[in-house]
Amino acid sequence: LKEVGVDAQILSSDMLRKVITPKPKYTEDERDIVYGALVFIAELLTKNGVNVIIDATANRRRYRDEARRRLPKFIEAYIRCPLEICIERESKRIGETYHAPRNIYKKAFTGESKTVPGIGSPYEEPLNPEVIVDSDKLSPDECAEKILKAIKRHFY
């Protein structure tokens, strides 16, 4: 977006969760609080002219539906990826670049965690996202370009 002159604030669910719940349990109640806070912050920012990108799994449709209801200029970008590719990518995360928890799939498969979306916790696929990006088939640049085209199509 910066390359085309559009500034945006990224709201990361993982970063916000660390502030709200320093020792997260990933319960349904905790997720309700975190996703509710994300939408609330996005709503405040957009009312003040700030473009917002919400970076979140939002494993329940109700979280995405609430964002769509409360944010007037909203598009849902579904970044689709097969589970085996997610597992491979997560295993290669290094450094502090990623704010997401580590070894989530390993913990899910060993029974240490029962809250990983799509494994121990439900993941409800979007029904009508404005754009679908198959991140296992496209490069990161191609994914970004497809999302940018959807943004332009809806707002410019």
Go through each PLM region and give its residues.
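Loop/turn-to-beta-strand initiation segments
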Residues: N48-V52, I75
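Conserved nucleotide-binding/hydrolysis micro-motifs of P-loop NTPases
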Residues: M15-R17, A58-R60, R80-C86, L138-S139
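Short catalytic-loop micro-motif centered on adjacent basic/acidic residues
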Residues: V52-D55, I132-D134
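Small-molecule kinase domains that catalyze NTP-dependent phosphoryl transfer to phosphate-bearing small molecules
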Residues: K92-K146, F155
